[in-house]
């Protein structure tokens, strides 16, 4: 399997689990309102920090190759524009993943 596709799958699964696990655990455990408030204070920024870490590690690779930075920038621009248009994070992520894949296939083959 292509390394890019494998990396995209891992990031997608990681992103899904970051959102699914807290909802799943909350529905399974009863009478946790006090604990949720305490945990929420700690975990409120966890998904943002994990996504940021995934983004930074995928955006900056050494040695820095211009085509990789260009592909990531193009994908990021499409993610921002699509989010501004539809206000839907899922659609913007899907569009940016598709654009990243297409741009990596097109720009690397040049």
UniProtKB/Swiss-Prot annotation:
Annotated keywords: Cell membrane, Membrane, Transmembrane, Transmembrane helix
One GO CC annotation: plasma membrane
Residues passing through the membrane, by range: 5-25, 62-82, 90-110
Family annotation (Pfam families): AzlD
Membrane topology: Multi-pass membrane protein
Domain of life: Archaea
Record InterPro entries: Brnchd-chn_aa_trnsp_AzlD
Compartment annotation: Cell membrane
Family: To A.fulgidus AF1754.
Name the record gives this protein: Uncharacterized protein MJ1155.1
Lineage: Archaea, Methanobacteriati, Methanobacteriota, Methanomada group, Methanococci
């Amino acid at each position: 399997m292509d390394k890019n596709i494998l990396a995209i799958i891992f990031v997608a699964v990681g992103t899904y689990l970051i959102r699914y696990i807290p909802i799943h655990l909350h529905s399974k455990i009863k009478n946790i309102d006090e604990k949720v408030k305490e945990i929420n204070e700690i975990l409120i920024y966890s998904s943002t920090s994990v996504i940021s870490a995934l983004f930074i590690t995928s955006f900056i690779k050494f040695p820095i190759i211009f085509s990789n930075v260009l592909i990531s920038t193009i994908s990021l621009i499409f993610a921002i524009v699509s989010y501004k248009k539809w206000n839907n994070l899922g659609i913007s992520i899907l569009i940016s993943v598709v654009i990243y894949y297409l741009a990596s296939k097109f720009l690397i083959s040049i």
